[in-house]
Amino acid sequence: TIDKFNDYYVIQISTLGMDQYRDLIVKILVEEYNAKGVYERSDIKTREIEGLEQRKGFLTEPFNTDVEIIENGVKYIVDIENGQKTGFFLDQKENRAAIHKICKGRDVLDCFTHTGSFALNAGIAGAKSVLGIDVSQHAVDCATRNAELNNLQDIVKFECHNAFDVLGTWSREGKQYDVVILDPPAFTKS
């Protein structure tokens, strides 16, 4: 996997075959794509199946690993060093854009919020209120920072909860939302 965040690249290599081309990949990213920096996030267990150690770190000169990006009109600070996978799920771009069509004037709950991307898109789209929850305090802190970056802190809030624990309780308490976003982590690894 190669993810591009402005002029910075994050690579994640899971197989022995691609691992042998790491240096060439970095060289091409720097020389042909003018990468300002390349960071490796091959800190995944699937590498062990191929007899590879997990790896994480700079493949060029060090740089600030909090990279600001804009997607669908929403600003994010992506933590490519400590965020999940490569720091941001770029493949969800169109799903985040689709949120705009259903959230205006609604109360929204975003479970497993991670960087707050779905919650922030709901806020930008004009949601009445948004609550994003995640089991990781680090994720909640990053999402809160992203809400502040977009001046959405009055509408979009984040709390540290395990969705599996609180959803049943909230249902019994009568808490209701107009839109509930569920994007849980993978339950099985391929």
What do the predicted segments below correspond to?
Residues 3, 21-88:
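Non-catalytic substrate-recognition/targeting regions of SAM-dependent transferases
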Residues 14, 43, 185:
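Flexible loop residues that form catalytic
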Residues 61-190:
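Rossmann-like S-adenosyl-L-methionine
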Residues 8-13:
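Carbohydrate-binding surface patches
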Residues 1-7:
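Short intrinsically disordered, low-complexity coil segments enriched in acidic
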Residues 16-18:
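Helix N-cap motif at beta-to-alpha junctions
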